[in-house]
Every structure is written in structure tokens, then in C-alpha cells.
A protein has these predicted regions:
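N-terminal structural segment of carbohydrate-active enzymes
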Residues: 2-213, 221, 227-232, 237-424, ...
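Hydrophobic faces of well-ordered beta-strands that scaffold small-molecule active sites
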Residues: 115-117, 158-160, 214-216, 442, ...
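Aromatic- and carboxylate-enriched substrate-binding clefts and catalytic-loop regions
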Residues: 205, 216, 221-250, 315, ...
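Active-site neighborhood of glycoside hydrolase catalytic domains
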Residues: 294-296, 301-302, 310, 403-496
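Conserved alpha/beta catalytic core and glycan-binding cleft of carbohydrate-active enzymes
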Residues: 319-359, 363, 482-617, 677-680, ...
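Aromatic- and carboxylate-lined catalytic core of secreted/periplasmic carbohydrate-active enzymes
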Residues: 587, 610-652
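Carbohydrate-binding surface patches
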Residues: 651-712
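C-terminal beta-strand-rich structural cap/linker in extracellular carbohydrate-active enzymes
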Residues: 732-757
């Protein structure tokens, strides 16, 4: 009886959304739209399944009311909207739930698109840096390409990078679980009485009802003083910097006799005084006379600094430090014996902790092992500085870029024992994120190198990175709770640890290495990647196959460490890169989705990194001709069963750039033939100079001439698909051809022919 009453009291989500939607229509003056304009927009969406506009165009040309009007067709197509009303079951907001999906295979499917989106970047950056707001986000839903559920291809997955409050403006340095206030739409707040979190939740709900799964970028570490850390101090390692400074100062006094062997006593005392000052403030100038002594002190103390930092990181010391941290926090908040939540934390807590010399132990370099060794405070004493070492004890501080992050205290590095309470908090934290926003999956950041020599020895963790067993527990937990929940690992395939990430950690898709290896990804090498995946999957006992992303672009492409992104290839080169990933199908055992970034569709250059590092709108390139080509290639690929269900085979690839490949499916009488010049107009290649140093060289593609191909097997060419400026158009041949000749192919030119048996 009680269960029945509970069910009776559960809020009907469709009814609630209809109430909200009515207010949105009233606020946007929906009823004032002209019928002619309504019909125009709806007809486009009926034709394509989405509005085939670039984001800048929809920002500039569509009102909020027009956006809602056109979106109604997407909702109708998904069976959740009829006669002006939403109608769906409470547990079927996600398109995966509505279609009764039982595993993560939907994310792996050939032909499926994943689009990386930053909510802040969706505003009109050509006009203002003001971050995107609610209707900017909703306009993105309208223009997202659809899939083909008859072939199990879901509509484009929205992959959201972190939308939380940021430190230093960076999306990957969260300060709390709360949505950034910069995203708040004051008009929506005033008219709907929705706070910024509710605005994001509504956006995700509308996107899922329009057919788009939504996944979120999550971190296996926290921001330096993120609120989850301050509410649960035991989940991080802590250093008492004042204690470390005192210990180093004492040791400095002890090594005076050793210094007196080489230097005058008076000079040593002056240098020691300056050194102790620098431990606290980091600032100081040395004449050449004292600099030599300073460097000698640094050399002598290096091992000691490592030793005392390691000692302070051990469990017994950490328990004492956590107790001290809790006392400081309790005093700052004027609370006692209270279980804290993020809502209890304020800026005063951070001030009191740092005033007491209490800082979280940071991450480090991608190859760091052990714990970082405290060196001194920064100039003006605003934050601590550390040295980082790898598993061989080599100094890798120059590679360290994670000193602003706080790794979870998952494991005691001194003995390899796991901290189960920390693991439980971590998993519950991400479970709560999923519940709050109804995410369909996670992309888990920073999980490269977690099973190699840099992060574990004989199976025991040795670095700050999340141990693989924790990720395994997280994935199992989420998939047991939500059968269709899919996870994507940021693993770049180094050393081929496929089994470890797939079978042991339960990831569905791996990030791959397409961005750092952009210049190596010729059609033949992409096919070798497909074959690598096939070889792994055919060996599996069950049909839970692994997938690798085909990455046209991601947020790393513009970073200095990689410096590889599509616009470097020129317009034709970028389109051909997109075409390659769409038309080099891997077959049954190598289904691979394609990832791209908001802005790629219009050949936007150098803006992704800016919006990841700063909470601003993206400045977009207004190249609508490029958009038409980009969009048309995607639609064309999804229109062919041979592409989404079949397999590509390289017929020939020559060093001058000439390549031909066949795309076929055994049960079909039709196939496709692609002929291309795979050279890009411009492309960066890495090579070694005469000193053995790695350098980047820009190369220019060349035209190729007088090529021919004999149609393979019993196929004959019957038509060519030619881009007409807006779409690809089929042009039938007068006669069926068995041979094709090409007088000239310019760099990145490609031709698509239909073959029949």
C-alpha cells in the first residue's frame, strides 16, 4: 500500500515539462510567429531530421521562438511530442531508455557521431565573449545531426566538457560540483524561476527528448581546494608546509660543516639566511658569489626534501593532518561534529587552511611517480612549489602541469593498500552527478598510463593517478545501475593495453591517438587501426566488443604538446580528413564512432583551447561553404548501408598520394569505390634534425597525374556522387564502366563512385 502511495506521489515529468514549455513559449512570444516562417523551418527539419545550419547562423538568424518551433519536429520524430504536448514515461527521457538499450554498444557504432560541446562557448563569440546562455544551448540541439535507428545509429551524442565553477577559468580545474554562475540566464531565472543548475538540467532533458544521448567529462581528481575535498578532507593527501619549511631549515643548519669545506663561513651564513627566506616567500636575488653556495645547498638537500615529503604522505601522518585540517575547517565555519557538504564550504575555509600552511598534495607530470617533493613557496608566498620524479627517480618537473589539481587519496603508496572510504566517496560523487543530470555515459579524463611502468609496479600503484581497480569498480557500478551507461577512456593506445581497459576496467570506447598522430593517419594506416581492433575483438568470447574513436578533432589538438588539428591541413585537407573517418569503415569487429568539436563544421581555427582555458564564447569562422561540404559528407556516409554496416578495403595506396578503396557489404549488390589524393595541401610532419632533435616541418601536397583503376571483382561503376555546392548529387553514367581514368587529382581531392554487381 505504501509503495502504491509513493508511486501516486511521483511527479509526472511530462506534465511538469509541459508546464515549463508553456512558460517558455509565452516568454518567447511563440504565438506571434508567422505561419510562413514556421512552415519554412519545419520543412527543413522534416527533410534532414535537423536544421542544417552552422551554429553561428542559427545564433544570428533564429529567434528563441523559431528555435522551439523547429525543435518540435525533432521531438515529434522521437515520439515524445504530439499536438503541442510532451508525452513520455518518467524513466524514458533518455533516447537509450526509450529504445530499451541494454548495453553500451550504441556509443561504439560505425556512423555514430560524438560532438564535444562547451556550454560557455555556445554564445556568439563574434559579437561578445559573454558565455553562452540557455537558448544558445537549445539552438545547438536543433542543428545536431540525426542518426538512423533502423541501423542502430543514434543521433549525435552530446559530449559536454565540465560546466562547473572554474579555477583560473579552466574547465578542468573545478572549484565545486555546482554549475558555473557565468552560465546563468537571468531572463530564464526571472521568468521560469529556474536557477542555473535547473537550466542545465532542462537543456539536457530537451536534448535527450530530441534523440541525443548526453555524456559528461569527469575527472578522477579534484581541483586544488575543490569543495568536495574541503567537505571530505580525508579524500586527499595533505602537506603541512610550515612543518616542511621548519624541517628543511633545521637540516640546512645541520649541513653547515659540509659547506664549510668549500666556502667561507660568513658567506654560508648570508646564503642560509636568504635560503630560509626563500623557503617562505620564493623571492630573492643572489650575486654570483652566493649563487654557487645556494645551488650547492639545493643539491645537498634534494634527497632530504623528497624524504620528508614522502614521510608526511604516509598513512599515520595523513591521519594526523586530516584531523588538523578538520579542526581548522570547523573553526572557520563555526561548526563542530557536523558532517559537512559542499554547501557548507565558503572562501574563508581556504584562507584559514593556507594561513595555517595546510595545502593538498598536487598531481604532477603525466609520468610522475611517488609524491611531489616540496621545494619552497612561490614568489610572494602565495602557493607551494614542488619537484616531481618518475618511477626511476628522474626529475620530470618540467613536464608537470597538474600542480593545481588534487588527486584522490585512493591508495597508500607506501604499502599499496587501498582507502576504501575514499573510493566509496568518489563513486558516490559521480553517481550523484549522473542522477542530477541523467547522463548516458562518462568520458573519464586523465586515465592514460595507469597500467604501465609509470603508474604501477608488479600491479601495485606507485603514482597519483587513479588505479585501474577503482575505475573498474566505478564502471561496473554505473553499468549495473544503468545497463546502457557507456564509458569512454582517455587512453591513447600506447603499448596496446586493450584488455586492461576493456575487460578489466570495462570501458566501451578508447580515446585513440588520431590527434598526436594526425600526419601518420593515411587511409592505409587507418585501415591498419581497424585491423588492430578487429584482431582484438575476434579473440573475445562474448560479443561485448571494444571500440576506438576516430578523432577528427578534440580539445587537445590545439595544445602545444600536440599541435595537430584539422585546419592546419587547409580546407580541402580538413574535409578529406573528415571524409576518411566517415568512409573507412572497419566492419563487424571494428565499429568506430567519430568525434569532432563544436566549431569544426565551419573551419574555425584556434578557438577551442581558448574556451577550455577561459569561460568565454567561441569566435567562429563564417565559412558556410565549408559547412555545406562537412555536413553533406556526414549525411552521405549515413545514407549508405555499405558504409555503416560494411567494411572498407584498400585496393592500392601509392607514395605519391594516390589511393583507392572499396566499401562493401557481403549481402549487398551495390558497393562504393573511393579514389583520392591523400596528401593534404599543407601538413605538419615530425622528423629529427642532424642533432637528433625532434622538429616539425611543414610540407605542401602535390597534384598527381594520369592514374587509373580497374573496377575490382564483378563490379561495374554505374554512377558518381558529386558535390553541387549544397549536397552530394548522384550522376549516372551512360554506360557501366570497368575502368576509370583520372588525368589529375589535386591534394585531398576525392571521388565517390557507386558500383553494382
Amino acid at each position: 500500500m505504501l509503495n502504491f502511495l509513493k508511486k501516486q506521489n511521483v511527479e509526472n515529468k511530462a506534465e511538469k515539462l509541459n508546464e515549463i514549455y508553456g512558460k517558455l513559449k509565452e516568454y518567447t512570444h511563440f504565438d506571434e510567429l508567422k505561419e510562413e516562417r514556421k512552415e519554412q523551418l519545419r520543412n527543413i527539419v522534416k527533410k534532414y531530421g535537423y536544421l542544417n545550419y552552422p551554429h553561428l547562423k542559427v545564433l544570428e538568424e533564429l529567434s528563441a521562438a523559431e528555435t522551439l518551433c523547429a525543435l518540435e519536429i525533432k521531438w515529434e520524430n522521437n515520439g515524445v511530442f504530439k499536438d503541442g504536448k510532451f508525452t513520455f514515461k518518467n524513466d524514458e527521457v533518455s533516447p537509450l531508455a526509450r529504445n530499451h538499450v541494454k548495453n553500451g554498444d550504441w556509443l561504439k557504432k560505425e556512423g555514430h557521431d560524438i560532438k564535444l560541446i562547451n556550454l560557455a562557448a555556445l554564445g556568439n563569440g563574434n559579437y561578445s565573449e559573454t558565455p553562452g546562455k540557455f537558448f544558445d544551448w537549445v539552438k545547438q540541439i536543433l542543428i545536431l545531426p540525426t542518426g538512423d535507428l533502423k541501423r542502430n545509429i543514434f543521433d549525435t551524442t552530446i559530449y559536454l566538457i565540465p560546466f562547473q565553477e572554474r579555477n583560473f577559468g579552466c574547465a578542468y580545474l573545478p572549484t565545486s560540483s555546482s554549475v558555473s554562475k557565468e552560465l546563468n540566464d537571468k531572463n530564464i531565472e526571472d521568468n521560469l524561476h529556474f536557477n542555473v543548475k535547473e537550466q542545465v538540467q532542462l537543456f539536457i532533458e530537451l536534448a535527450q527528448l530530441a534523440g541525443h544521448p548526453v555524456i559528461y567529462d569527469v575527472l578522477p581528481q579534484a581541483g586544488r581546494f575543490e569543495k568536495i575535498v574541503l567537505a571530505n578532507p580525508n579524500i586527499a593527501r595533505w602537506y603541512d608546509i610550515n612543518y616542511l619549511i621548519d624541517k628543511i631549515s633545521q637540516k640546512l643548519d645541520e649541513i653547515t660543516p659540509e659547506l664549510e669545506k668549500d666556502f667561507a663561513k660568513e658567506d654560508i651564513e648570508v646564503t642560509k639566511t636568504l635560503y630560509k627566506q626563500m623557503l617562505k616567500s620564493g623571492a630573492g636575488d643572489f650575486s654570483a658569489k652566493y649563487k654557487e653556495i645556494y645551488e650547492k645547498i639545493d643539491l645537498i638537500l634534494e634527497d632530504y626534501k623528497k624524504e620528508i615529503s614522502e614521510e608526511l604522505s604516509k598513512k599515520d601522518e595523513q591521519e594526523k593532518l586530516v584531523k588538523k585540517v578538520k579542526e581548522v575547517i570547523s573553526k572557520a565555519l563555526n561548526t563542530k561534529n557536523k558532517h559537512l557538504t559542499e554547501d557548507d564550504i565558503n572562501d574563508k575555509v581556504i584562507m584559514e587552511l593556507t594561513n595555517n600552511g595546510l595545502w593538498t598534495v598536487p598531481g604532477g607530470a603525466w609520468c610522475s611517480a611517488g609524491v611531489p617533493a616540496f621545494q619552497k613557496m612561490s614568489e610572494c608566498g602565495s602557493y607551494p612549489l614542488f619537484k616531481h620524479y618518475d618511477y626511476e627517480g628522474k626529475d620530470v618537473t618540467k613536464l608537470a602541469n597538474l600542480d593545481c589539481q588534487t588527486p584522490y587519496y585512493f591508495v597508500c603508496l607506501e604499502n599499496g593498500k587501498f582507502n576504501n572510504k575514499v573510493i566509496e566517496i568518489f563513486i558516490k560523487h559521480l553517481e550523484k552527478f549522473q542522477e542530477d543530470y541523467n547522463f548516458d555515459g562518462f568520458r573519464i579524463d586523465h586515465v592514460d598510463h595507469i597500467v604501465d611502468k609509470f603508474s604501477q609496479k608488479d600491479g601495485t600503484p606507485i603514482s597519483y593517478r587513479a588505479p585501474w581497480k577503482i575505475l573498474s569498480e566505478l564502471n561496473k557500478h554505473m553499468k549495473n545501475k544503468i545497463p546502457y551507461f557507456a564509458t569512454l577512456a582517455e587512453y591513447m593506445l600506447w603499448d596496446k593495453y586493450y584488455k586492461e581497459y576493456h575487460e578489466d576496467m570495462h570501458f566501451d570506447v578508447l580515446w585513440g591517438n588520431d590527434i598526436p598522430c594526425q600526419s601518420d593517419k593515411t587511409p592505409e594506416n587507418i585501415m591498419l587501426d581497424n585491423q588492430e581492433l578487429t584482431n582484438y575483438n575476434v579473440s573475445l568470447k562474448d560479443k561485448n566488443y571494444l571500440s576506438f574513436l576516430k578523432t577528427y578533432n578534440n580539445q587537445d589538438g590545439e595544445f602545444e604538446a600536440f599541435d595537430r588539428y584539422p585546419t592546419q591541413l587547409g580546407e580541402n585537407g580538413a574535409i578529406f580528413k573528415w571524409f576518411k573517418y566517415k568512409f573507412l569503415s572497419g566492419g563487424k569487429f571494428a565499429n568506430r564512432p567519430v568525434l569532432y568539436v563544436d566549431g569544426d563544421e565551419t573551419f574555425t581555427k584556434g578557438e577551442v583551447e581558448k574556451t577550455v582555458g577561459s569561460e568565454i564564447s567561441m569566435r567562429r569562422n563564417k565559412n558556410y561553404h565549408f559547412f555545406n561540404r562537412f555536413d553533406s559528407v556526414n549525411r552521405l556516409a549515413k545514407s549508405f548501408e555499405a558504409v555503416t554496416e560494411g567494411e572498407a578495403q584498400i585496393i592500392t595506396q601509392e607514395d605519391d598520394g594516390y589511393v583507392c578503396w572499396l566499401i562493401s557489404k557481403e549481402t549487398l549488390k551495390t558497393a562504393l569505390l573511393v579514389v583520392a589524393n591523400y596528401q593534404a595541401p599543407t601538413e605538419y610532419f615530425t622528423k629529427e634534425n642532424e642533432n637528433g632533435e625532434s622538429i616539425t616541418e611543414l610540407k605542401y601536397g602535390q597534384d598527381i597525374f594520369d592514374k587509373s583503376i580497374s573496377i575490382p571483382g564483378d563490379y561495374k561503376a554505374v554512377a558518381e556522387y558529386v558535390f553541387n555546392g549544397e549536397d552530394f548529387e548522384r550522376t549516372d553514367f551512360a554506360n557501366k564502366e570497368t575502368d576509370l581514368k583520372f588525368n589529375k587529382l589535386y591534394p585531398s581531392q576525392f571521388k565517390i563512385f557507386e558500383l553494382q554487381r
